[in-house]
């Protein structure tokens, strides 16, 4: 048996211009659970008049990830709001509906989302996420994966993962491949063949904020 030491060179989970939105999140967490007659009614509860565009986006994203669980297809944004569940398409469509009210440019992106080593070698356009344009910059949001994950018993576990609010495109491409190349947002796009044959990365690695570190596994054997 040998102890294996891995030296990992890690990027921070958040790019340099990501701000601290804790005050915005605190406002969102105060919103009471209600039934709504229309999407605009919810929007008025989420977004305060003083919010800047980026703050509006993060408030909307935080509300959705805190209040919507992965479950049955809702089909319409208002259904998603009131049933408090949906699939990835519902997360994306509700985000679009709220961003449209805020008059923020946003885009629906479909593509492949990888969650298992069994996905290696295959491509399946089975997922959706969003891109917003703020101050002439594109930002990626995957609210489904930010809201939580499906465990080994196929049960959705609510667990906020802030990595999927504006992740670096170079990290996002490790487990997301858009059907349209332009939404990679990379200067040197990855080919589909490169993507499907690369390793699958566990989402937990993105939560590490160390730039360098040593990870030790005393149980690893070769």
Which positions does each model-derived feature cover?
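Sec-dependent N-terminal signal peptides
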Residues: 3-14
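Alpha-helix boundary/capping residues
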Residues: 11, 46, 64-67, 179-180, ...
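Secondary-structure boundary elements
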Residues: 19-87, 93-102
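Hydrophobic/aromatic-rich core segments of domains that either
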Residues: 93-171
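Alpha-helical and coiled-coil interaction segments, frequently adjacent to or embedded
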Residues: 151-222
